[in-house]
Design a protein with these regions (language model features):
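Membrane-integrated ABC transporters
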Residues: 1-42, 62-69, 87, 91, ...
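Short intracellular "coupling" helices and adjacent cytoplasmic loop segments at the cytosolic face
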Residues: 2-9, 90, 96, 104-128, ...
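An intracellular "coupling" helix at the cytosolic face of ABC transporter transmembrane type-1 domains
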Residues: 18-26, 115-118, 132-141, 145, ...
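Transmembrane helices of ABC transporter permease
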Residues: 23, 27-40, 143-198, 271-282
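Transmembrane helix-loop-helix hairpins at lipid-water interfaces of multipass membrane proteins
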Residues: 28-83, 164-168, 281-284
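Helix-loop-helix
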Residues: 55-71, 161-176, 250-319, 324-325
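Cytoplasmic coupling helices
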Residues: 89-108, 149-150, 173-218, 225, ...
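ABC-type nucleotide-binding domain
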Residues: 340-557
Length: 557
């Protein structure tokens, strides 16, 4: 996979994220309208208080009585609460719907990239991306798009309102809005991007190290390596803490600068208003209204200033997410090809390598239909790689692999997957029951079908001996089961899938001779209806094959 620190510009990131909002546009518009109306109510609560003071002092006021002023304050306060709640509810509804959509897209990207682009990928880093990085985008969707629109409309409205009294205090107020809501966020975002990226990467590295430490805890305790592991966790935590401290320092600096700018803007508006009052160009009522407006109208604009620090993390997280979504798969999915039925396979002059190492060199072999073909060879000779090429997890570099007369690169991916079942040396299990873990090979399988597959895999008796039988939870990553039991679940899945081409990579490596014999007899029975490609080191396993090949140094003999 590409380096997730591929640096997109903030503008490019914003455009990509905003495009996703299109289906939710009516709700977004409603949130903006309610936000502007809510801030209007909040500001005029203060202004009505000023009118009450003018009325009580016997000065000219738009409101006839103090009671009228307090009545307006009460009504606007209630409206402010309702509008604020509705705005936030709308924004968060949009945010959580879009986060769900992004998670769906990320899961689709992971499926598209698997396995070629994800082999060797740090799982802790992936977990951090799928959880923390996507969750960080909530700030953009719930607290950025709508607040930015609200702030722009609000600043224009308040500037026009003050300009109604006089243009000079309005210009002073507008200058403050621009400094706090535009210049400050841009400045802080540019200066904070590197720190934010470093923090997100440090967080991902820490998650990876902790996850690795938890999974290897048994070995760490056995070999008394706890001190070194603890030191490693401490080092990662200190690095993460230093990056977080740098971020918080910047956030504190932005808050201080924001408050200072608001104070100077208010003083500027007051000073200009008093100067105009002395010149007779602005009444006392205007001085009070302009000053109170400056004091109470910065709420939406301050939200933008605070975004400057927060958005640096959002953009860093979005960059990582977009890097994954944009990653091109090694083997693009075929949807406009052929749905070629399996009628045997042929490997013609195939060469393949990765990481600068040639693994297979011009190998050729024929896999006849409804036969058991065995492949043996030393570890690292390319046996498992050949199986993955037949599954089209990678594409061959030279030569071709054919189903019948059709190159598998022209076979529709869905059709190819439906016709192949691969059992690897490591069986991945989900935190679910044994039955459901087997049933992922065929979701609509009846219980009788599941049990029949388990009998073929020498697993049924073991499952029935458990108190909950097929409803027994396997734990995280199948932690409650032995390696042999997990492997037999993988074999049972393949039998249940009922694909015409069965690829078995060391299917009995973790089994005793008794269970190996049961499975091999089942494989022999299955070859009446299926083609089986069997990879193994064991001579006893190879004895089940109709024809055998040996892979040595990337060549077949």
């Amino acid at each position: 996979m590409n380096d997730t620190t591929t640096h997109r510009t903030p503008a490019a990131i914003v455009v990509r994220l905003i495009v996703l909002v299109k289906p939710m546009l009516p709700i977004m518009v409603a949130a903006i309208v309610m936000g502007v109306a809510g801030h209007f109510c909040a500001t005029f609560i203060t202004i009505f208080g000023g009118f009450a003071i003018l009325t009580a002092a016997g000065l000219q006021s738009p409101l006839p009585t103090v009671g009228t002023a307090f009545g307006c304050i009460l009504v606007f306060a209630l409206l402010r609460g309702v509008l604020r709640y509705a705005e936030q509810a709308s924004n968060h509804y949009i945010a959580f719907r879009l986060l769900a959509l992004i998670r769906y897209k990320v899961f689709g990207a992971l499926r598209r990239l698997t396995p070629a682009k994800l082999e060797g990928r740090d799982r802790g880093d992936l977990i951090s991306l799928i959880t923390a990085d996507i969750e960080a985008l909530e700030v953009f969707y719930a607290h950025t798009i709508s607040p930015v629109c609200i702030a722009v409309l609000w600043a224009a409205g308040m500037t026009a309102f003050v300009a109604h009294w006089h243009i000079l205090p309005a210009l002073a107020l507008l200058a403050g809005y621009l400094l706090v809501g535009a210049a400050l966020p841009v400045w802080s975002a540019k200066r904070g991007q590197a720190v934010a990226r470093e923090y997100r990467q440090a967080l991902a590295d820490t998650n990876s190290y902790v996850l690795e430490s938890l999974r290897g805890l048994r070995d760490t305790l056995q070999y008394q390596d706890t001190a070194a592991r603890a030191a490693g966790i401490t080092a990662h935590s200190e690095t993460l803490g230093a990056k977080q401290t740098a971020l918080k320092y910047r956030e504190g600096l932005i808050v201080a600068v924001t408050n200072t700018l608001i104070l100077f803007t208010t003083l500027a508006v007051l000073g200009v208003s008093l100067w105009l009052y002395q010149r007779g160009e602005l009444a006392a009522q205007g001085v009070l209204v302009c000053t109170l407006t400056a004091l109470s109208s910065f709420g939406p604009v301050v939200a933008l200033a605070n975004l400057g620090a927060g958005l640096t993390q959002v953009f860093a997280s979005a960059d990582r997410v977009l890097a994954l979504l944009d990653e091109a798969p090694v083997t693009p999915e075929v949807t406009d090809g052929e749905n070629t039925p399996f009628a045997g396979a042929e490997v013609r002059g195939v060469s393949f390598g990765y990481a600068g190492e040639q693994v297979l060199r011009e190998i050729s072999l024929t896999i006849p239909e409804k036969k058991i073909v065995g492949i043996t060879g030393r570890s690292g000779s390319g046996k498992s790689t050949l199986l993955r090429l037949l599954m089209r997890f990678w594409d061959v570099q030279t030569g071709s692999i054919r189903f019948g007369a059709e190159d598998i690169r022209r076979v529709n991916t869905a059709a190819l997957r439906a016709q192949e079942s691969l059992v690897t040396q490591e069986t991945e299990l989900f935190a679910d029951t044994i039955g459901n873990n087997i049933r992922i090979a065929k979701r609509d399988a009846a219980q009788e079908e599941v049990e029949a597959a388990c009998k073929k895999a020498a697993l049924d008796d073991f499952i029935r001996s458990l108190p909950k039988g097929y409803d027994t939870p396997v734990g995280e990553l199948g932690g409650t089961l032995s390696g042999g039991e997990r492997q037999r679940i993988g074999v049972a899945r393949a039998f249940l899938h009922d694909a015409p081409f069965l690829l078995l990579d060391e299917p009995t490596s973790n089994l005793d001779s008794l269970n190996e014999g049961i499975i091999l007899r089942a494989v022999r029975a299955e070859c009446k209806d299926r083609t089986v490609l069997l990879v193994s080191h064991r001579k006893s396993t190879m004895a089940a094959a109709d024809v055998s090949f040996s892979v040595e140094s990337g060549r077949v003999s």
